């Protein structure tokens, strides 16, 4: 039911696309000149075209191999800070659902990057982080510097918020460790991994051919399918509910998940609330009830689709007392479809508060949502009068959606709002929208306290890579989003908080250096 603009349909590009770096052929994989050449062989085999880095001597062997053996592929992006390098990879992963390489120097570069790694972990972003240490061979260490920049078990510094880390002891261990790291990283739920290489191991001459993985080997396990019997129960609950709500958070990590949710909503004619970790559902769709909190008092069933944060949308926080009030009607039922406890860590508390679920289903929503749609269609087909009843519900939702969007857009042109200083979020969102609305645009992260989401026409999956994260993350992730769309010729818009940029103003140099087009609209709140 959602409509697309001309730009979304691909009839217009904002600028000339910049093609991806072309991968050169390496004829003798596993038999280069130096051990670090084997790492490059694996990077070529796993097809990751970019590597964001801040150079350091601990991986000078790998750096040399990337240039002289790998033909400068992956393309190396010089960054002003390791944190920014990881954030660029984070934004790229958000926008493409594919991993990117970030390379960090020794212990100090790893420690510089660890906040960005933590945010990638809690945001489930697949980032292949390469680091280096040592030399562990004491006789090869340079005075002082190699001693103070080396740690025993260096991966321990980020082990609590990465999915996997490894440090191969021999060159023959490099391919298997790399392959396992990639598999762990890309198995849902995704997350960053850290691969550490000893400095002297990289620089030693390769004296034998290393056994490489078969090019036909499966790199990642198949997606996890949910239990059919439990899915049938969920479908019956969804069909019998008077006012169900689909609560989506990470189901939009892929185009397939986005499209599947549209089909499910159109089948069931029910409300959808997008928590915006990724763009899960079109903002222009008449069943999109995101940011319309008054609907919660009518909801009798919530179906979470790859949702971690159940509490924030379903409760009202009283900040002064740190207490919460439920928004939900008494007797509302809850069904959780996603990865449940598979990501849980004994260290990080990102798993949120435990909910009283009526059904809990483990499975990938890329599979579960189409399965749920099929089951619901079968129930509709054999239940007389149900289809017209559902369509009537959909019409009421569409009326509320249209009314709310009209009110939001009026707020952006309201005379009193336009006199406020600093500029009101609704006004700034409106002004930017009037300039970009006929382009094929992408919003990188922050949405001006969701006013861009209220006013702009989010009519395609690529429009938004997901909501903003913590302070000092937006400019870096925005560059990664812009890099991901660089070959599409789209207009990339970053609604940039001023205080966030001050953490890493050098990021703008990275954009200029590596030809990453992006419109940065600075929101200065006159504070920080």
What are these regions (language model features)?
Residues 2-6, 10-18, 49-50, 94-131, ...:
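Structural signature of the thiamine diphosphate
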Residues 4, 10-30, 169-172, 196, ...:
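Phosphate/pyrophosphate-binding active-site segments
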Residues 30-118:
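N-terminal cofactor/phosphate-binding cores enriched in small/glycine residues
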Residues 35-49, 54-58, 62-67, 398-486:
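Active-site diphosphate/adenylate-binding microenvironment
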Residues 53-56, 76-87, 102-110, 169-170, ...:
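Active-site nucleophile and cofactor-binding loops and adjacent substrate-binding regions
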Residues 139-150, 296-298, 369, 451-528:
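Thiamine diphosphate
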